[in-house]
From Swiss-Prot:
Residues 837-846 have a biased composition (Basic and acidic residues). PROSITE patterns: HIS_ACID_PHOSPHAT_1. It comes from the Eukaryota. The gene is VIP1. This is Inositol hexakisphosphate and diphosphoinositol-pentakisphosphate kinase VIP1. It catalyses: 1D-myo-inositol hexakisphosphate + ATP = 1-diphospho-1D-myo-inositol 2,3,4,5,6-pentakisphosphate + ADP; 5-diphospho-1D-myo-inositol 1,2,3,4,6-pentakisphosphate + ATP + H(+) = 1,5-bis(diphospho)-1D-myo-inositol 2,3,4,6-tetrakisphosphate + ADP. Disruption phenotype: Abnormal accumulation of InsP7 and reduced levels of InsP8. Increased weight increase of P.rapae and M.brassicae larvae feeded on mutant plants thus leading to a reduced resistance. Increased susceptibility to the necrotrophic fungi B.cinerea and A.brassicicola. Increased levels of jasmonic acid (JA) and bioactive conjugates such as JA-Leu/Ile and JA-Val upon mechanical wounding, but reduced induction of JA-responsive genes in challenged mutant plants. Changing D292A: Loss of activity. It is found in: Cytoplasm, Cytosol.
Amino acid sequence: MEMEEGASGVGEKIKIGVCVMEKKVFSAPMGEILDRLQSFGEFEILHFGDKVILEDPIESWPICDCLIAFHSSGYPLEKAQAYAALRKPFLVNELDPQYLLHDRRKVYEHLEMYGIPVPRYACVNRKVPNQDLHYFVEEEDFVEVHGERFWKPFVEKPVNGDDHSIMIYYPSSAGGGMKELFRKIGNRSSEFHPDVRRVRREGSYIYEEFMATGGTDVKVYTVGPEYAHAEARKSPVVDGVVMRNTDGKEVRYPVLLTPAEKQMAREVCIAFRQAVCGFDLLRSEGCSYVCDVNGWSFVKNSYKYYDDAACVLRKMCLDAKAPHLSSTLPPTLPWKVNEPVQSNEGLTRQGSGIIGTFGQSEELRCVIAVVRHGDRTPKQKVKLKVTEEKLLNLMLKYNGGKPRAETKLKSAVQLQDLLDATRMLVPRTRPGRESDSDAEDLEHAEKLRQVKAVLEEGGHFSGIYRKVQLKPLKWVKIPKSDGDGEEERPVEALMVLKYGGVLTHAGRKQAEELGRYFRNNMYPGEGTGLLRLHSTYRHDLKIYSSDEGRVQMSAAAFAKGLLDLEGQLTPILVSLVSKDSSMLDGLDNASIEMEAAKARLNEIVTSGTKMIDDDQVSSEDFPWMTDGAGLPPNAHELLRELVKLTKNVTEQVRLLAMDEDENLTEPYDIIPPYDQAKALGKTNIDSDRIASGLPCGSEGFLLMFARWIKLARDLYNERKDRFDITQIPDVYDSCKYDLLHNSHLDLKGLDELFKVAQLLADGVIPNEYGINPQQKLKIGSKIARRLMGKILIDLRNTREEALSVAELKESQEQVLSLSASQREDRNSQPKLFINSDELRRPGTGDKDEDDDKETKYRLDPKYANVKTPERHVRTRLYFTSESHIHSLMNVLRYCNLDESLLGEESLICQNALERLCKTKELDYMSYIVLRLFENTEVSLEDPKRFRIELTFSRGADLSPLRNNDDEAETLLREHTLPIMGPERLQEVGSCLSLETMEKMVRPFAMPAEDFPPASTPVGFSGYFSKSAAVLERLVNLFHNYKNSSSNGRS
């Protein structure tokens, strides 16, 4: 027999038939691997060619011992099956199961049959296009298949595996729209369609749950069941722009699979009987899922992979056709015999630090930033009692007919219903021209008109910034319709309409610019270090946002600048930003203390005197220690001036509103098309509106007047001669907005009003969070308690991971030594895959690491093109509102005043305390940054091993507007203020240890044990568990031909 002759070493070589379309055969990866196989000298490669495959009968096809055959466009799979049945070669990839790969339904069914995790999904099968199916329901924000509901965002895939037109539909709360994913065309792999809301109906589709993966996809490539190579790439979901290197190739980076993922790779390979097989992996919330199986796939541009694949395929073919031959690899791989040995030098450490450094030994380990949202429109609220039948019926329609239940209207359908009802109730007269003598009726009609104007604003609806509450107040008993007894019916309800507070075009630009600044200045690597870290999974990034739309969009715009993304914000928001309302929203925990502070503040402002306790320290040395610090001494006089100037501006806007043509909003039945830019915040200045003398954005003069008249009325009640100082921040907010965005309206006295409002707001706003340091600390700790606890968890986890790396290095050296000695005694190739059960032993740091509930993956450091391969940087970004910024800052600056910490020095130096006292406002995009550095030169037990650097920025800078120069003119033209750079909160050269930081703020932070428990997926033993990490390195870095791999190209 031929193979017996081959076994003696003098017969024919093992013939490997390549029955593949020429386009695939002559691809670079296939050529690299086949050339390596042939260089072993044991194989003869037979290329069938397109003519033979397509035209010749199978009987005349070359006879081979091993067959490489896989389906591609135009490939006659049936012929290949007939040939295999006739000649019975060893099949590298089985042919029969390749039919499964053409139907995504069968792929998912097969994966589930083998217990391989897949996303939650459901199938919609149509026999003809546009067929109505009783089990399929579509609503505005979800689809339902056989009773199973999929909320947006969800994914829609054609069941045809060769159709790559995949859609992702986004919820209305994020602006709606659809993103289409497709095979790469040039530099694009997806496109966003903001107007598409309804799903496709022309065929059969799979609907599956969208999984947030941090904007990165993982591609896994198996070569037999015991080898898997994984790469990361930027997900097309984010912005659809393909990242390419200088050679024009898509940028991909090797990553290490977890033990569970390695087992999944093995099972995919076995389940589909495809030795060479590529599949897509989704990593989401600590779990991994297979979402697509592609069949025959090779890695591109990885010489390490080409080496591995050739070695594994060689062993497979020898085991199948010559099992008595040794499959031990030669000491030097044949294709590396003539290559020079390359040096491993050049991986040097890079020092980092804004405030001083420990030299070349210091490494940045963690960046934590708490950021306020960007520039927004003024927040508005309209309250009115309604008795109109149409509005009461509307309330009953959406609260289930319950007479005492309130209802919230947010969706487009609900708001359209309200608009229709309101249009029929609003008098057709213009503001300021009413003849009605009843003041209450006049005010009611004015508020109804305001509600109508708000609902018509922009010509669309978006729950992200407009919502209405209807709460019943009075009821009467009426006979039931069937005459059987009585029932309650509401006759009066309170309507509360909240609107405004939308991120402006300027706010979006500010956030994106700040993200770009962080990328270039907060991380080592000359501006590109962060992007390399992120792409290689060595940048552990999480972005959190409160529930408010302006905060979410600020986070998305910041991420766009930070990661150098392109495209619309909605896909970035859904892919990268996690909402955490309990941590970043709300003031409920401190509402009692804040009311007390406001009452005391009102007393100080309206009485005209400052109240300083006798036992307080000298206000000259520590001015921030006095009650009401920062309030102007003549606050009472300024308050009356504020009222007068506010009335003056309001009257000017009233005259503009009187001249506004109401016909702009008619005819009522025509609604302009949906505009995502307006729903989520304008992306650009509407130059035409401004040129025609209209207010910036979509606000008309009627709404502008409503904004100012409400401020004037609420600020001062003439009948009771009573001031409401809580309106001062709102007056300042409105004034600042119009000064920046509506300067072209030339409102007389606006500049003067702004100066007075700023003086008062600079004193009032900080004191609303506590009238003195002790109260500021108490209120701050209640508002920011959960956020402070999360920050401590972030810092602690980073420290534990860094310490594990240091300990791991010693283990690696021992493993290297052991591996080398054991390799000398081996007579056969060791497994390239280690059973996952061996990798699931828990590590010592698991419990601590699980507290954070965050997924952690490891980079294959050997192939990372970075200066310091061991560097792993954790970034946590928390986007929130002004209240949380003030609260966190107050905890940091006053924590040493707590009784439990008496005698401790402040975390913030005296110089910084003085600057903070003068920094009255933490404006839009203000931020606090904590950076954690590790000094690897000191011992692991030394407190100086980890130091914290604290910086802050007061955000948008108004000062340039005071100058009548070119810069001021440009800022006014662009409506965008610059963001102040970071300022130090510690002395240069000082060292705030992590240990000290934890001790000082722990009393004001939520304990780690109070956070929800983390769920660890089966087989995932933590980020740096020692046993798993060491074996993981062994699998990926130390093959039995390691002694020659240093010659390889990478």
